[in-house]
């Protein structure tokens, strides 16, 4: 058994498991944040209400987390569109060269996908979910909630696409399964793109806050 062990065979599974754990942690953070918000809003009228994401104190840690979230979001957008426009259409192209060629491509794609895509997706979801707990100056909390909702929507639409890929991997190319894969991939690409656009909106609002503070400091001199 030790003679046939190849450590790189387990690496894609490790990346995929890491993504699964990070997405699950994101869901738990979102549920906890929602429960916290409901509890705070249910408190008596005179009690402190949750803010809209404006912090009186600038947090370098929050800004670093935001940079990570935006970077991972746009990495995901780029890889998502590459899969949509290049990788998945090759399934149909390779099927014209026979079952062996199709299976070789399918195996190669599925074995490499987690290495390039899984951890960035998990990091994107986890960083945005964590930002629900870290106020960002001049960034409404509801905007972060929308992005977290889109991250969780990705988790919902991914299994049908994965099932279609799995059927083609085990049974060979099928036009019906391929159409199902592309349909759900359309949804995923739209979700990633929306996340990327909203990430830029969040970053712009945060930078506008920094510029406003700099202008105020200059007027005081």
Feature roles, as predicted:
Residues 2-17, 34-46, 51, 55-120, ...:
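Interfacial loop at the N-terminal end of multi-pass membrane proteins
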Residues 38, 127-142:
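Juxtamembrane helix-break-helix junctions at the cytosolic face
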Residues 211-221:
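Short, highly charged, low-complexity non-transmembrane loops/tails of multi-pass membrane proteins
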Residues 59-74, 136-152:
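Interfacial segments of alpha-helical transmembrane regions
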Residues 29-37, 194-206:
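Membrane-water interface at the C-terminal end of transmembrane alpha helices
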Residues 146-170:
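Hydrophobic alpha-helical transmembrane segments of integral membrane proteins
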Residues 169-201, 211:
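Alpha-helical transmembrane segments of multi-pass integral membrane proteins
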Residues 117-129, 191-196:
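Core segments of transmembrane alpha-helices
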């Amino acid at each position: 058994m030790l003679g046939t062990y190849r450590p790189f065979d387990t690496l894609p599974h490790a990346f995929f498991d890491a993504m699964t754990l990070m997405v699950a942690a994101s869901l738990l953070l979102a549920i906890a944040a929602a429960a916290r918000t409901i509890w705070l809003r249910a408190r008596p009228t005179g009690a402190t209400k949750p803010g809209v994401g404006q912090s009186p104190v600038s947090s370098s840690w929050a800004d670093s987390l935001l940079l990570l979230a935006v970077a991972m979001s746009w990495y995901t957008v780029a890889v998502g569109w590459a899969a949509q426009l290049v990788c998945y259409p090759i399934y149909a192209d390779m099927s014209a060269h026979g079952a062996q060629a199709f299976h070789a491509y399918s195996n190669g794609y599925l074995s490499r996908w987690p290495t390039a895509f899984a951890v960035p997706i998990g990091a994107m979801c986890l960083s945005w979910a964590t930002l629900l707990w870290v106020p960002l100056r001049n960034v409404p909390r509801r905007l972060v909630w929308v992005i977290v909702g889109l991250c969780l929507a990705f988790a919902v639409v991914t299994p049908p696409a994965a099932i279609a890929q799995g059927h083609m991997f085990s049974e060979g190319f099928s036009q019906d399964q391929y159409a199902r894969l592309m349909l759900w991939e359309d949804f995923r690409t739209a979700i990633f793109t929306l996340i990327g656009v909203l990430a830029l909106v969040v970053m712009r609002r945060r930078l506008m806050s920094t510029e406003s503070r700099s202008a105020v400091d200059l007027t005081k001199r």
